[in-house]
Amino acid sequence: MNLMSWLTIPTSITISTIMVTSSTHWIMAWTCLEINTLSMIPMISKPNHPRATEAATKYFLTQTLASMTMLFAATMNALTTSHWEITLLTDYTAITLMTMALMMKIGAAPFHFWLPEVSQGATTMTSLTILTWQKLAPMAILLTLSNKINQTILLTMAILSITMGGLGGLNQTQMRKLMAFSSIAHTGWILSTMALAPNISALTLSIYIMTTTPIFMMLHFTSTSTIKDLGMMWTISPQLTSILTMTILSLGGLPPLTGFMPKWLILNKMVMFNLMTEAALMAVMSLLSLYIYLRLTYISSMTLTPHINTTTMKWRMNYKTQPLTSSTLMILAILMLPITPKL
């Protein structure tokens, strides 16, 4: 792929996402989402491998189905209300269809079937883009419609996403697929308070992106693709490996790390609205994900994988490629809990 393509594709992805978040018209938002989808396909299929081609095909078909449903819902609402504004979505059937379409775009259960396979077929940094940046545009629309979406639907999908994210990641050995199930579980936490407190949902999404990004950057810089490779990451950068351990625990929501902040705020808000049963169920189901993160921590920092004495020891990363950005994000992903009372 030539230089012009690599300049055009990231620019299209960035601008289309920004335009969706600032759009007030359904046709404009739908068009930008389509541009965003079409820009991602060359990035996914870039390795020129059958698995990458399969991932790009699955991504295209799923996103196209979601876009068709989204356009159908917007048209149905326009026929009823004679308006195309996003904030004037009032038809109940259109709201339900729009919710389903947006859930499919972000990979929430039970529409999560495509996300692990696409993440595994793409490269590490492309998978990072799918699991973080590509969620911004649909989430922005969901936050705009948060006061119109049925709370029962959101809570049902939230609990189902947390459960499926935990169960799906239990038997995984591939890091990208495991992080995809982690994304599904965190999507459930984001959806849980979207109708109650959209600002907490936005905070949860921000902290998830801030925590996931350095993990993927470390996987990319150390060429780690499986859990077995994670056990030898210390030979490349012992310091960053120790910080990575704390970042993984933060992703699991273990106090006193940053990842505990959104879960604390979400459960507190749900208890305030007398949703004790749902809050308890979410907390119990999140233990499945926490077990996965503890297993990663144990493998990366608390044990040494079997290896022969002639194993090549890299000892240090090349300082020219030292991921300083990931180091900064790791620190933020670990130490931001004390600012919670200020939020």
In which residue ranges do the predicted regions lie?
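Core, highly hydrophobic multi-pass alpha-helical transmembrane subunits of bioenergetic inner membranes
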Residues: 1-343
